[in-house]
């Protein structure tokens, strides 16, 4: 406590300040703490009050209508939290609603107010997501805070472990022998590019001719993705004639030797494709042949890039779909007849497989061939490796353009050009199916009408005798027939009497 005393005079003034501080007693501190706690409500009370406001603010005809059981729960928890245990007598039979409320309240027993508040808020959490977002609901959410529990899923952890182990297996450089072939997987394009670079470095040491070819391919900055193929020797045998344009015979003859030497030294597969002589030389091959791992799975898809490449191959220029491989590529041309077109020689490493979107290429006759624009086809043979590897073909036009290789002979890919005809066939089949369905529906309608008419006729025939005689008539014959049988003798006698009377008059 602080006391200040002041005194002022006419000629002078003096000020006396006396400060007296009383001792802080422990019971005073406990009393003040109780008063402060009484003034500041607890967290449960604030949440309870916010939840009560939400329930009270619900419109009668709103989108959210709680059930009677739910309202009884809220009522019982509210009464228990505000008034404590139920001490009232049960209402009479004339107040059924009051009896239901009393039963719900008394069922809580000796539950404390704090527990009732917590239960009220917990029930509110169950339905708060189905309620419309209002200011009261926002206030309640702000008071409650995040009330979702994070549960660790053991299955997800196991799946993550499996994926990590699978990633380790994929990233490992060890090769596994499967069905007589060496199989190893790469984790992605980066690891494949690294392996390609290592193979390029190893190829540089093979000879000076190979170095020249590798430098030419490196200058083009092409993406090289190498997949694992078959392990074993490869015999290269191509029996085909190369016809090129006479105007570019000089440069092609100079580039022919390095290309052949590099392909023989590195053991590459040579894939022949042709280009029309009328096409612009500037529109050379562009795009990327994506080399993917050829596993034994029947259906798989590497990425969304596959679909983009497919669209590019189906809709692009016929001469712009050959991509230079990083191992060996050279334009091999020889002077001769220039009427057919110029050829591109694409060298692909022997143990690899050239794929586009993970699909195989196969000609209609089952053997690799190359076509010309005039419809001519020139077959060339090759020595196959493994169980099903074959040299793919590249034909001109959007329908015949595909680079691929077979896996184990278990999966055969269709030509990309057949997709258009396949779609047309599917459309025709659907149209015919619709026509057949319409015919079937018409026949069914006719059958239904015939059966209905026959049923009506049968009902009419069955109802005809019953309509001729009433239900109360005991005899089998109709009443008219019976009346005619009774009356006709009298009629006959009357007619005979009339005849005799006329005869007598004539005689008289």
From Swiss-Prot:
An acyl-CoA binds at residues 55-64, 75-79, 101, 120. InterPro entries: ACBD5, Acyl-CoA-binding_prot_CS, Acyl-CoA-binding_protein, Acyl-CoA-binding_sf, FERM/acyl-CoA-bd_prot_sf. It comes from the Eukaryota. It is found in: Peroxisome membrane. Residues 181-214, 428-453 form a coiled coil. Its main location: membrane. The modification Phosphoserine is found at residues 184-185, 187, 191, 206, 233, 303, 405. Residues 198-215, 240-260, 353-376, 408-418 have a biased composition (Basic and acidic residues). GO terms for molecular function: fatty-acyl-CoA binding. GO terms for cellular component: peroxisomal membrane. The chain crosses the membrane at residues 480-500. Pfam families: ACBP. GO terms for biological process: pexophagy. Keywords: Acetylation, Autophagy, Coiled coil, Lipid-binding, Membrane, Peroxisome, Phosphoprotein, Transmembrane, Transmembrane helix, Transport. CDD domains: ACBP (cd00435). Residues 175-215, 240-300, 318-340, 353-419 are annotated as: Disordered. The modification N6-acetyllysine is found at residue 446. Residues 44-133 form the ACB domain. It is a single-pass membrane protein. PANTHER family: ACYL-COA-BINDING DOMAIN-CONTAINING PROTEIN 5 (PTHR23310:SF6), ACYL-COA-BINDING PROTEIN, ACBP (PTHR23310). Belongs to the ATG37 family. Acyl-CoA binding protein which acts as the peroxisome receptor for pexophagy but is dispensable for aggrephagy and nonselective autophagy. Binds medium- and long-chain acyl-CoA esters. This is Acyl-CoA-binding domain-containing protein 5. It comes from Mus musculus (Mouse). The gene is Acbd5.
């Amino acid at each position: 406590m602080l006391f200040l005393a002041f005194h002022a005079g006419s000629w002078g003034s003096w000020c006396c300040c006396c400060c007296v501080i009383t001792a802080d007693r422990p019971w005073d501190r406990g009393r003040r703490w109780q008063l402060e706690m009484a003034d500041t409500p607890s967290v449960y009370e604030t949440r309870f009050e916010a939840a009560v406001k939400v329930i009270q603010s619900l419109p009668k005809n709103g989108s959210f209508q709680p059930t009677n059981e739910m309202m009884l729960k809220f009522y019982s928890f509210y009464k228990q939290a505000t008034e404590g245990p139920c001490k009232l007598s049960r209402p009479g039979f004339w107040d059924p609603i009051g009896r239901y409320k009393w039963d719900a309240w008394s069922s809580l027993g000796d539950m404390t107010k704090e527990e009732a508040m917590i239960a009220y808020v917990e029930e509110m959490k169950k339905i708060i997501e189905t309620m419309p977002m209002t200011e009261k609901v926002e206030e309640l959410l702000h008071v409650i805070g995040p009330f979702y529990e994070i549960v660790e899923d053991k299955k997800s952890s196991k799946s993550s472990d499996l994926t990590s182990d699978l990633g380790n297996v994929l990233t490992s450089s060890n090769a596994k022998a499967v069905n007589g072939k060496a199989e190893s997987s790469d984790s992605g394009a980066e690891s494949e590019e690294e392996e390609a670079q290592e193979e390029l470095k190893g190829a540089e040491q093979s000879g000076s001719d190979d170095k020249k070819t590798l430098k030419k391919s490196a200058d083009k900055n092409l993406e090289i993705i190498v997949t694992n193929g078959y392990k074993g020797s490869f015999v290269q045998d191509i029996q085909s004639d190369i016809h090129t344009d006479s105007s570019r015979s000089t440069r092609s003859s100079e580039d022919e030797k390095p290309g052949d030497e590099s392909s023989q030294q590195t053991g590459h597969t040579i894939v022949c494709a042709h280009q029309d002589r009328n096409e612009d030389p500037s529109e050379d091959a562009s795009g990327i042949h994506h080399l993917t791992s050829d596993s034994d799975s029947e259906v798989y898809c590497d990425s969304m890039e596959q679909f983009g490449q497919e669209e590019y191959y189906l809709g692009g220029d016929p001469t712009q779909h050959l991509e230079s491989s990083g191992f060996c590529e050279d334009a091999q041309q020889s002077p001769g007849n220039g009427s057919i077109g110029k050829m591109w020689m694409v060298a692909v490493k022997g143990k690899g497989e050239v794929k586009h979107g993970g699909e195989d290429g196969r000609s209609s006759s089952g053997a690799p061939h190359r076509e010309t624009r005039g419809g001519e086809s020139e077959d060339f043979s090759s020595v196959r490796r493994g169980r099903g590897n074959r040299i793919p073909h590249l034909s001109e036009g959007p329908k015949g353009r595909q680079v691929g290789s077979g896996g184990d002979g278990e999966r055969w890919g269709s030509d990309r050009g057949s997709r258009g005809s396949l779609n047309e066939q599917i459309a025709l089949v659907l149209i015919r199916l619709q026509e057949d369905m319409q015919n079937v529906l018409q026949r069914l309608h006719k059958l239904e009408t015939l059966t209905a008419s026959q049923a009506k006729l049968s009902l009419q025939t069955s109802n005809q005798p019953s309509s001729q005689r009433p239900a109360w008539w005991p005899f089998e014959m109709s009443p008219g027939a019976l009346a005619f049988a009774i009356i006709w003798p009298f009629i006959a006698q009357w007619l005979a009497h009339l005849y005799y009377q006329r005869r007598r008059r004539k005689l008289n």
